[in-house]
């Protein structure tokens, strides 16, 4: 994912946490905040409580891949995805399905996704 699509600064994360709206399921919490950009920006948070670096990076890769697949279908917003404990035991396809579910609830897609 290109640099323009990333949220890295702590101040950006804090703004989205405070002013954004949150939606959750068992595996993920998603914060969304309307931005003035012409595309979405993504921040990913995976706690050390979820496992070692290999496990955390696998979860982050699966989340990033899901956003790459739906890049054209996502509304221009700042989005933060926080992984919860059950996500560590899921396969990439299960992560994709669960993430799509919570993103539909958050109304981040600009059209219907199967």
Swiss-Prot record:
EC number of the protein: 3.1.26.5
PROSITE patterns registered for this protein in UniProt: RIBONUCLEASE_P
InterPro entries reported for this sequence: Ribosomal_Su5_D2-typ_SF, Ribsml_uS5_D2-typ_fold_subgr, RNase_P, RNase_P_CS
Entries under Gene3D superfamilies matching the protein: 3.30.230.10
Residue intervals passing through the bilayer: none
A Pfam family that the UniProt record links to this protein: Ribonuclease_P
GO BP terms, alphabetized: tRNA 5'-leader removal
Keyword tRNA processing listed: yes
Top EC class of this enzyme: hydrolase
Reactions listed under catalytic activity: Endonucleolytic cleavage of RNA, removing 5'-extranucleotides from tRNA precursor
SUPFAM superfamilies xrefs: Ribosomal protein S5 domain 2-like (SSF54211)
Keywords associated with the record: Endonuclease, Hydrolase, Nuclease, RNA-binding, tRNA processing
Example of a GO cellular component annotation carried by this entry: ribonuclease P complex
Gene Ontology terms for molecular function: 3'-tRNA processing endoribonuclease activity; ribonuclease P activity; tRNA binding
Purpose: RNaseP catalyzes the removal of the 5'-leader sequence from pre-tRNA to produce the mature 5'-terminus. It can also cleave other RNA substrates such as 4.5S RNA. The protein component plays an auxiliary but essential role in vivo by binding to the 5'-leader sequence and broadening the substrate specificity of the ribozyme.
Protein family: Belongs to the RnpA family.
Subunit structure as annotated in this protein's UniProt entry: Consists of a catalytic RNA component (M1 or rnpB) and a protein subunit.
Name under which the protein is recorded: Ribonuclease P protein component
Organism (species): Staphylococcus haemolyticus (strain JCSC1435)
Encoding gene (name): rnpA
């Amino acid at each position: 994912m290109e640099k323009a699509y990333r949220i890295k600064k702590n101040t950006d994360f804090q703004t989205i946490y405070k002013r954004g709206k949150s939606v959750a399921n068992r595996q993920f919490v998603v914060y969304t905040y309307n931005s003035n950009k012409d595309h979405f920006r993504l921040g990913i948070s995976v706690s050390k409580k979820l496992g070692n670096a290999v496990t955390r990076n696998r979860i982050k890769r699966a989340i990033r891949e899901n956003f790459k697949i739906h890049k054209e279908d996502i509304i221009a917003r700042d989005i933060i995805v926080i992984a919860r404990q059950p996500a560590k035991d899921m396969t990439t396809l299960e992560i994709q399905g669960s993430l799509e579910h919570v993103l539909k609830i958050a109304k981040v897609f600009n059209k219907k996704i199967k």
